[in-house]
Curated annotation (Swiss-Prot):
Gene that encodes it: vapC44
Protein known as: Ribonuclease VapC44
UniProt-annotated binding residues for Mg(2+): 6, 105
GO BP field: negative regulation of growth
Subcellular location: Secreted
Swiss-Prot/TrEMBL cofactor(s): Mg(2+)
UniProt-listed Pfam families: PIN
Primary residence: secreted
Length: 142
């Protein structure tokens, strides 16, 4: 299954100073042949976070975009359009979302399910039950 990488996983992979850089690199090295994906949400989130002055080792917006562009220009990467809607109850069970912090993760998991892929994150608290049809294979926690 192709892996949709969470913003924090992208940060860890592309920032050598990130506390989880080695863990993310080890994971992607073992999984790269299956491919990885990004979407508008993860790309924009990466650029927004890494370019904030409060980020531990911030870079300019232009540098962040260039860094991500270089990472995606590989045969292993695929861009996924955000083709699912949080408003669709067949895609996301809103009764399972109990906090605003769960919204983006549930959406990204649903996007991975729609693409028959898996969502890769450091977040330990993602509820599979929020996305109808999601199984353990659709979620990888590093």
């Amino acid at each position: 299954m192709r892996a949709l990488l969470d913003v924090n996983v992208l940060l860890a992979l592309l920032d050598r100073d990130h506390v989880d850089h080695e863990r993310a690199r080890a994971w992607i090295t073992g999984q790269i042949e299956r491919g990885w994906a990004s979407c508008a949400i993860t790309q924009n989130g990466f650029v927004r976070v890494i370019s904030q002055p409060r980020y531990p080792s911030p870079i300019s917006v232009a540098h962040a975009i260039d860094l991500l562009a270089r990472a995606t220009h590989t045969r292993y990467h695929e861009f996924w359009s955000c083709t699912v809607s949080i408003l669709d109850s067949k895609v996301i069970d809103r009764s399972r979302l109990h906090s605003p912090k769960q919204v983006t993760d549930a959406y990204l998991l649903a996007l991975a399910v729609a693409h028959d892929g898996r969502f890769v994150t450091f977040d330990q608290s993602i509820a599979l039950t929020a996305v109808p049809g999601a199984t353990k294979q659709h979620l990888a926690t590093l």
